[in-house]
């Protein structure tokens, strides 16, 4: 199943703590999805009153830095597996008070996504277009980045290359 990493950072004297690579209330606890999310270890609140921020990211990894976590999309996304492996999801639930309920973390896709439509025209009839061997390449795209796990910002790094999109 899919795996996400969860960090939990407690508030101190009512003020949000700062996410760190280690030393948080919980550091990068793997949660695996089957029919529901299952943590690799039991997780408990610090006490009955201390609020916490919950940080979630996908896919699960072993970040040595939470402010510049390296991630690379596949330049060849022609297969569904490579396309899906190029997705990065991040989310936060801020200021959560201790509760016996599950903590809900809203997540977002932080990498770019593009939908390309090709259609007949300019010398192509529907029939000739359908018979043509058409390929698409997206040029001048940086496929490497760092993700700041504390705020979800992404910074492109490295050289630009060509990406073959999923069809």
Language model regions located:
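Short, low-hydrophobicity acidic/polar segments
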Residues: 1-141, 162-167
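Intrinsically disordered, low-complexity terminal/linker regions enriched in Pro/Ser/Gly
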Residues: 146-167
């Amino acid at each position: 199943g899919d795996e996400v990493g969860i960090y939990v950072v407690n508030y101190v004297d009512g003020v949000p703590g700062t996410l760190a690579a280690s030393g948080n209330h919980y550091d990068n606890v793997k949660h695996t999805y089957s029919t529901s999310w299952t943590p690799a270890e039991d997780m408990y609140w610090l006490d009955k009153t201390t609020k916490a921020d919950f940080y979630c990211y996908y896919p699960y990894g072993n970040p040595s830095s939470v402010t510049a976590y390296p991630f690379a999309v596949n330049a060849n996304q022609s297969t569904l597996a490579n396309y899906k492996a190029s997705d990065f999801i991040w989310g936060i639930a801020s200021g959560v008070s201790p509760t016996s309920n599950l903590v809900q973390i809203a997540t977002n896709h932080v990498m770019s996504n593009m939908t390309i439509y090709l259609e007949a025209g300019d010398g192509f009839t529907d029939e000739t277009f359908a018979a043509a061997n058409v390929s698409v390449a997206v040029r001048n795209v940086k496929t490497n980045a760092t993700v700041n796990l504390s705020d979800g910002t992404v910074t492109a790094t490295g050289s630009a290359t060509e990406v073959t999109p999923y069809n």
